[in-house]
Amino acid sequence: MSVTEHKKQAPKEVRCKIVTISDTRTEETDKSGQLLHELLKEAGHTVTSYEIVKDDKESIQQAVLAGYHREDVDVVLTNGGTGITKRDVTIEAVSALLHKEIVGFGELFRMISYLEDIGSSAMLSRAIGGTIGRKVVFSMPGSSGAVRLAMNKLILPELGHITFELHRQ
């Protein structure tokens, strides 16, 4: 079956959990979390869960695993904590949970960021994607620009297709 055929069979609506990772954001100031919600809704997807967690490995893992265990969540989208500072532990937290890494997500995100957005600073991004069982997790930087780029160029065009692939036998 071709990629085109897979995409035709893919679900049009995917159920998502948004996790913002920040020591300072609130629901009122979480611009990237709000942007994720808007972009998903505009694309016909549903946000079934949203939370803000602190920049610590245990809190991040608990939030991601809570999404994994929910029947009304197909995808967990995290934003924040993907840089190289001491407090940036999202990648360490999420990668330890992944069964399979979607290596192309991070590679393409950095390439597009380099070419279309922030130039050589793209090398500082540690965005990651992968699967836990039949769920997919994408971890992207916390800036609204990075979220918009990741969602519009990579995640939204493939969200239904990825979900379809994870449920094939």
Swiss-Prot record:
InterPro entries: MoaB, MoaB/Mog-like_dom_sf, MoaB/Mog_dom, MoCF_biosynth_CS. SUPFAM superfamilies: Molybdenum cofactor biosynthesis proteins. Pathway: Cofactor biosynthesis; molybdopterin biosynthesis. SMART domains: MoCF_biosynth (SM00852). It comes from the Bacteria. Pfam families: MoCF_biosynth. One of its GO terms (cellular component) is cytosol. May be involved in the biosynthesis of molybdopterin. This is Molybdenum cofactor biosynthesis protein B. Belongs to the MoaB/Mog family. Keywords: Molybdenum cofactor biosynthesis. GO terms for biological process: Mo-molybdopterin cofactor biosynthetic process. PROSITE patterns: MOCF_BIOSYNTHESIS_1 (PS01078).
